[in-house]
């Protein structure tokens, strides 16, 4: 059954896909994340995500957590550079409970001072964990290198100093400025009719007043490649290289998504993995990644290896990039790349929580939301020349930033 999009009486958008599953998923997705913090608010978006569950006007922190767990459900949240998600998975008979709970959390969280201080300790431990995990830390530091001086480069967790200075007043101000009407979407995939879900959402979300004041984002411009080598107490070298790429609205995003998957995506058969790990055993881990934001994107290659293998690995990476820039995919290669990506997306879409989050994400950025079939058709329409064009525009080592931990 296709998804449906409905506007509630207060203008809030709801996207829902009806299923016959015994398990359902419902979420509140906000188009606000790390890049929307001021220079003195580092880590605030993530801290809001942590502390919004710490009690409401009518629920203690325990009652918030136990509300869904008592019926076998789960309550979760996540923060990224541009979005914050609050969502729950639950037996489909518990839709009223799920919708009411998320509305209560979202509109009536109290952020008690005592709970804020406790959660600061938790986040500081999280920051220390990442500092001790170079394979995680390098991703954050690489974004800071590429987006130097721009909010997209800021660490999602913040710093120890910035977290310690977060205040309840700052939290309330951030929510008021960023959790605005056109920045919020309700998303659902589950066993309930659209008509009944709309009634529930009108009951618990429809009467709330939500600010609709626009909030401009600082655009990212004037990228300059940088190379940085840092010495750390580690046994392996960790390397990242890459540059800005296409934003979420650009047509070139789809052929580049296909190209990235072929080059170093999920499969063990990716070109980078076959060349560096499988054939030569020079690295334990190698991958490429592509993330699209609202006004830019990021392409990166990551690998970890013994220090003596670092330069040979770099040479092999550049050779693979040369091949893919100078040789158009043949008919069989292109068909295989499409088949692999389509299959991966189909498997991911089988997880209905992922489908709910994907629908909500699309609703945040697009007026019209593609069906799964329409997304697949976009991939199938990609030509070998389009792949070659995006390869030559993005996969150029002269515009790469490079970060090395050794």
Report each predicted region and the residues it spans.
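Active/ligand-binding-proximal structured segments within catalytic/core domains
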Residues: 11, 18-68, 142, 251-263, ...
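Generic preference for hydrophobic
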Residues: 14-16, 28, 186, 241, ...
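His/Glu-based metal-binding/catalytic segments typifying zinc-dependent metallopeptidases
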Residues: 18-20, 27-29, 212-270
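Histidine-centered active-site/metal-ligand motif
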Residues: 46, 50, 150, 238
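Short, conserved beta-strand segments within well-ordered enzyme catalytic domains
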Residues: 15, 25-29, 52, 76-78, ...
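Short, Gly/Pro- and small/polar-rich lid/capping loops
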Residues: 1-10
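Charge-rich, well-structured scaffold segments of protease-associated domains
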Residues: 7, 63-213, 229, 246, ...
């Amino acid at each position: 059954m296709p998804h449906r999009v409905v506007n509630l009486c207060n203008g809030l958008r709801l996207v829902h896909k009806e299923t016959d599953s015994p398990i359902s998923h419902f979420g509140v997705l906000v188009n606000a994340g790390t890049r929307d913090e001021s220079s003195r608010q580092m880590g605030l978006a993530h801290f809001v995500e942590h502390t919004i569950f710490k009690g409401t006007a009518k629920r203690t922190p325990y009652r918030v957590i136990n509300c869904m767990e008592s019926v076998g459900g789960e309550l979760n949240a996540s923060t990224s550079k541009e979005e914050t998600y609050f969502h729950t998975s639950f037996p489909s008979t518990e839709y009223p409970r799920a919708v009411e709970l998320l509305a209560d959390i979202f509109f009536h969280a109290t952020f008690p001072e005592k709970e804020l201080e406790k959660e600061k300790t938790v986040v500081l431990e999280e920051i220390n964990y990442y500092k001790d995990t170079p394979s995680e830390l390098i991703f954050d530091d690489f974004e800071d290198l590429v987006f130097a001086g721009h909010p997209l480069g800021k660490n999602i967790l913040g710093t120890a100093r910035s977290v310690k200075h977060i205040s309840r007043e700052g939290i309330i101000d951030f929510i008021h400025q960023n959790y605005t009407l056109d920045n919020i979407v309700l998303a659902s995939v589950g066993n309930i009719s659209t008509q009944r879900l709309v009634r529930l959402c009108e009951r618990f979300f429809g009467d709330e007043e939500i600010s609709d004041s626009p909030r401009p984002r600082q655009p990212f411009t004037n990228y300059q490649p940088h190379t940085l080598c840092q010495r750390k107490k580690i046994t392996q070298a960790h390397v990242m290289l890459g540059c800005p790429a296409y934003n979420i609205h650009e047509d070139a995003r789809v052929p580049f998504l296909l190209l990235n998957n072929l080059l170093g995506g999920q499969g063990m058969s990716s070109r980078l993995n076959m060349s560096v790990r499988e054939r030569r055993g020079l690295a334990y881990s190698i991958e490429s990644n592509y993330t699209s934001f609202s006004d830019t994107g990021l392409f990166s290659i990551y690998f970890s290896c013994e220090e003596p293998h670092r330069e040979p690995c770099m040479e092999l990476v550049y050779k693979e990039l040369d091949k893919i820039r100078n040789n158009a995919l043949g008919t069989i290669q292109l068909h295989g790349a499409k088949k692999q990506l389509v299959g991966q997306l189909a498997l991911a879409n089988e997880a209905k929580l992922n489908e709910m989050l994907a629908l909500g994400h699309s609703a945040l950025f697009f007026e019209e939301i593609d069906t799964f079939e329409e997304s697949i058709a976009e991939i199938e329409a990609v030509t070998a020349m389009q792949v070659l064009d995006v390869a030559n525009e993005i996969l150029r080592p002269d515009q790469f930033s490079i970060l090395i931990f050794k």
